[in-house]
Amino acid sequence: MQTYNAGTFDVIVVGAGHAGVEAGLASGRMGAKTLMLTINLDMVAFMPCNPSVGGPAKGVVVREIDALGGEMGRNTDKTYIQMRMLNTGKGPAVRALRAQADKWDYQHEMKHTIEKEENITLRQGLVDRLVIEDGVCKGVITNSGAIYYAKTVVITTGTFSRGEIIVGELRYSSGPNNQQPSVKLSEHLEELGFELRRFKTGTPPRVKSSTIDYSKTEEQPGDDHPRAFSFDTVEMLLDQLPCWLTYTNETTHEIIQANLHRSPMFTATKKGTGARYCPSIEDKIVRFSDKPRHQIFLEPEGKNTEEVYVQGLSTSLPEEVQREMLRTIPGLENVEMMRVGYAIEYDAVMPDQLWPSLETKLVEGLFTAGQINGTSGYEEAAGQGLMAGINAARKVFAKEPVILGRDQAYIGVLIDDLVTKGTEEPYRLLTSRAEYRLLLRHDNADLRLTEIGHEIGLISDERYERFLAKQSAIEAEKERLQKTRIKPTAEVQAMLKEIGSGELKDGILAADLLRRPEITYDKIAQIVSRETFVTDEIAEQVEIQIKYEGYIQKSNLQVEKMKRMEDKKIPENIDYDAISGLATEALEKLKKIEPLSIAQASRISGVNPADISILLVYIEQGKIAKRDKEKA
């Protein structure tokens, strides 16, 4: 095919899903002339699976994206149909915000946001190859012969990469939701020497709302006073839609058991590795055969559609089996299935081939982000996309990449896990993966990351001023409570007795009283009058910082210890083969991962403490030899 020069840009983003839109917006807003290419303009920021954003760990990521200047939180706040705070009865480290999005409004709002950005060109096109010169990515070539040149390229092709849809015995080449797949780009990446692996994900059937008997299900309403994902959101949408809870039963399970031989999960048809933490209903029935039932949530896909997402029933069983098992579930006895559930297999680039900046080690100037890196979930994709877009733009401007630490953000945990440990299955972010999760809370994402967002140019001066005002208000209120003494008056003693707290023998500082588990900030406010208005957000932050001060200090000490290891950098071009005493597995892993610091090396699977000690001695001896040489 004849090719032609279609234009020159600073950054090209291939794909416009949740990773792609964040990458493109970050790059464009940082001043880089950005081209976004997508197979179908009608699918920008589309939600091919569940119509929700947030949840445990993921909701914190959305807050982090917002604090850094990304768009997912703002867009969700504009388009949600339900908002709920999860785990409110537990500690602050595991609380999480989750929204049901209107999936159609979400994608339309995001597309329009991109279209309004002056530095972004949004264009429909299918990328087949990259332009590579001397190991450096210089642009892309589309299937129509258009050559677009750029200084950096970000690939965010998601499950479109050589995608194949599977429903029972039916298997065909396709992207999600029966879209055109991207085949030749995967083949080209293999030609370049990238290691790809087949992964799998799935989605449940969609059913018609008017054919559901909701009287047989349990209503799951949104919060009466919904919280926002974005620091910028002032007014919340109060017109919410409920979700509904029902359950599978023994009849459902019998139908599934009788048809396991037709499920790609249990036949040679399935080649890809599925997500451990998002199993299909077939997988759940087999793995948890002792369970008499499984939860099913009925989630509306939007305000102006009859389609309902059957959360918990992800499946790739044949169409007629799906219809049969749906009708065994209470409330769904007469349900009409509008879309069949399916599994999709796709190519993933093994992420240990990336630097922590998400630039590939094999090709300079080429970045990858999202499900192509082996992750699952919109939020994980968006977080990676944001960081890849930031670093692609910073490379154009000859600036150092932004790399978030494991103590700074869940996004930092996610990327470090991927590039340091790799993944054998679709990676899902969990609170248990973060060793400093008390520091990485949903409520303090802005306090952790707004400074960085402002420094790199994604947070406006006006928003930064509002952030500083909030920060000052928190410190002022903490200081007030640390100085204010509460006397054991009859009124105070009566209140303490009423809530089951021990009476005061002497006066006590308000901050010390707040440290009692049963005492809330609201109770303190009833006793100690305030001269200035304190918002709910500031009150929450003051309470958490005072109540958990001891635990937070312990976590900070652990972080300082880790940072000392992070500061011990491994020299570039180190010859691991020259280090005697390293275990064979450690030698192989160190050569493959090429860790940047001793801390990162210590997190590599297969590298044990003895190997780290040998590596430290080798590096220190090298420094001594270098100093001796300089003195001579």
Swiss-Prot record:
Subcellular location, in the record's words?
Answer: Cytoplasm
Q: Which SUPFAM superfamilies match?
A: FAD/NAD(P)-binding domain
What do the Gene Ontology cellular component annotations say? cytosol
Sorted alphabetically, the keyword list is: Cytoplasm, FAD, Flavoprotein, NAD, tRNA processing
Q: SMART domains this protein is in?
A: GIDA_assoc_3
Task: Please tell me where this protein is predominantly located.
Answer: cytoplasm
Locate the residues binding NAD(+): 274-288
Which region ranges are annotated with the description Disordered? Answer: 203-226
GO MF annotations in UniProt: flavin adenine dinucleotide binding
Q: Name one GO biological process term.
A: tRNA wobble uridine modification
Q: Please tell me where FAD binds in this chain.
A: 15-20, 127, 182, 371
Q: Which cofactor does it need?
A: FAD
Flavoprotein recorded as keyword: yes
Instruction: Work out whether the entry's keyword set contains tRNA processing.
Output: yes
UniProt biased composition (Basic and acidic residues): 215-226
- Family of the protein in this entry: Belongs to the MnmG family.
How is this protein organized at the quaternary level?
A: Homodimer. Heterotetramer of two MnmE and two MnmG subunits.
Q: What does this protein do?
A: NAD-binding protein involved in the addition of a carboxymethylaminomethyl (cmnm) group at the wobble position (U34) of certain tRNAs, forming tRNA-cmnm(5)s(2)U34.
Q: What is this protein called?
A: tRNA uridine 5-carboxymethylaminomethyl modification enzyme MnmG
Give the organism the record lists.
Answer: Listeria monocytogenes serotype 4b (strain F2365)
